[in-house]
Amino acid sequence: MSGENVTKVSTFILVGLPTAPGLQYLLFLLFLLTYLFVLVENLAIILIVWSSTSLHRPMYYFLSSMSFLEIWYVSDITPKMLEGFLLQQKRISFVGCMTQLYFFSSLVCTECVLLASMAYDRYVAICHPLRYHVLVTPGLCLQLVGFSFVSGFTISMIKVCFISSVTFCGSNVLNHFFCDISPILKLACTDFSTAELVDFILAFIILVFPLLATILSYWHITLAVLRIPSATGCWRAFSTCASHLTVVTVFYTALLFMYVRPQAIDSQSSNKLISAVYTVVTPIINPLIYCLRNKEFKDALKKALGLGQTSH
């Protein structure tokens, strides 16, 4: 296609979630309440962790960093989704679409590395308890969280630069409720194999290597736990990792269903539904998984709410 005959797309139209007529206002209210709950829930975790001296430890520093990530993450997707429920035509500019894609990809990549960092923290706590405070220092925690964000945002910058260089000159109807890589590239009218290859390589690096680090950490944790002679001690040691392991399982399972499904079971409707669950529901579930099983956090929450200390 000759360059002079190409009219580049400057605006995308988001199809949004499939809804029955008349249900969009109910869905708007449902997702709005969910969004507000995520904000309040994660802000509360951050405030409680930073205001309670008993929680000034590496595990809770990682937890507050994860809550900050969840707030940013859900705020990248949900406002545009809510707008889509109220408007007949859900438009987003090309720059706005690339910006949304950049932050979505960056935050997913950051969470991969942050979960691996949290797995390392649990590994040291279980396998080297006497050296824990020497190995996992506040400085190291800051470096691990900083590295998670820097690596996630840098890799995503490269991915989005390649994707934004692709020419979009045909249909501008994006069959999704937010700007994701696969539905965007389906609208390309020039060869996008280079952008697709770069995306695959960088996604492999940022997803697989942190996952391998997490698996390796839990392999050593499992071996250490199995060496504990008493069943009570064994359960107590492993229960400290149960919340993080649950979040890791939910996170990677959702990613696999979203991006690594066989073509035979792939459909835009199911993909959008899984994406909606992943982008809105998991930011609610993750803090609950971490906090509801944690006695120290529940005690700090009761103290913050003026309900007094639990009896010992």
From Swiss-Prot:
Parts forming coiled coils: none
Keyword Transport included in the entry's annotation: no
Cytoplasmic face of the membrane: 47-54, 121-139, 218-237, 293-312
Compartments where located: Cell membrane
Transmembrane regions: 26-46, 55-75, 100-120, 140-160, 197-217, 238-258, 272-292
Alphabetized SUPFAM superfamilies for the sequence: Family A G protein-coupled receptor-like
Extracellular side: 1-25, 76-99, 161-196, 259-271
InterPro entries linked: GPCR_Rhodpsn (IPR000276), GPCR_Rhodpsn_7TM (IPR017452), Olfact_rcpt (IPR000725), Olfactory_GPCR (IPR050516)
CDD domains according to UniProt: 7tmA_OR6B-like
Cross-referenced Pfam families: 7tm_4
Cellular component GO terms held in the UniProt record: cytosol; plasma membrane
S-S pairs: 97-189
Glycosylation sites: 5
Membrane topology: Multi-pass membrane protein
One GO MF term: olfactory receptor activity
Keyword terms: Cell membrane, Disulfide bond, G-protein coupled receptor, Glycoprotein, Membrane, Olfaction, Receptor, Sensory transduction, Transducer, Transmembrane, Transmembrane helix
Family from the record: Belongs to the G-protein coupled receptor 1 family.
Purpose of the protein: Odorant receptor.
PANTHER family, A to Z: OLFACTORY RECEPTOR
Protein name per Swiss-Prot or TrEMBL: Olfactory receptor 6B2
UniProt organism field: Homo sapiens (Human)
Gene: OR6B2
